[in-house]
Amino acid sequence: YAREKGVKIKLVAQVVKVSDRKFTMFVMPEFVTPGKYIYSVDDEYNGVVIRGECYDRQFMFGKGAGSLPTASSILSDIMARQHDYRYEYKKQHYLDRPEYTTDVELKVYVRYTETDVLKILHFDRITEQYRGEDGNYVIGYIRLSELLAKREVLRGKDVFMADFQSFFQELDR
């Protein structure tokens, strides 16, 4: 499907401010079009797109730390936690803590072989559906809360799922 549409599949982490008091976050494969910054990020390289109140969007790109530096960093964090070390973040005392929400709608692509998958997932609406000998897929809108509630059931199924329309679409043009 991705090759046919001229897109790449990338594993993308997203943290999105939904409202003044709420945010959502998730990690999911995403279909990435050639016009997006992250399209050209391959192999051991990482990329991040951020947007702040005092600046427009920024894209940062670079080589990942690799397995040894990453393992060292994780070990350091574990040791710090065992010794009750806490990183200081002074602004937390002055700002209201935002609330995490999964009550957001995602547009997703779901490829499946077992037909009961559509009975398990409750889409708000389906925009495209295909059934064939090689497999089936559906593109539609579904709540993140629904995906999280059904994740254990889906793990036992032959299912591939990808974010079809990034939350950050407007950031990445």
Residue ranges and their predicted role:
Residues D42-Y89, E99-D103:
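ATP-dependent carboxylate/acyl-activation modules
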Residues K22-T24, Y45-G47, Y55, E105-Y109, ...:
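Active-site lining segments that contact anionic ligands and/or coordinate catalytic metals
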Residues Y1-S40, Y45-G47, G66:
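Substrate-binding/catalytic subdomain of NAD(P)-dependent oxidoreductase enzymes
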Residues F23-F26, F31, Y45, F59-F61, ...:
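Phenylalanine-focused residue identity feature
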Residues S19-R21, Y37-Y39, G62, S72, ...:
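Generic alpha-helix signal with a bias toward terminal, lower-confidence helices
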Residues A13-V15, F31-T33, C54, G64, ...:
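A broadly conserved detector of short glycine/acidic/proline-rich loop/turn motifs that flank catalytic sites
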Residues I78-R173:
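A conserved regulatory-domain signal marking ACT and ACT-like small-molecule sensing domains
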Residues K10, Q14, E30, Q58, ...:
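Functionally constrained cores in energy, signaling, and assembly domains
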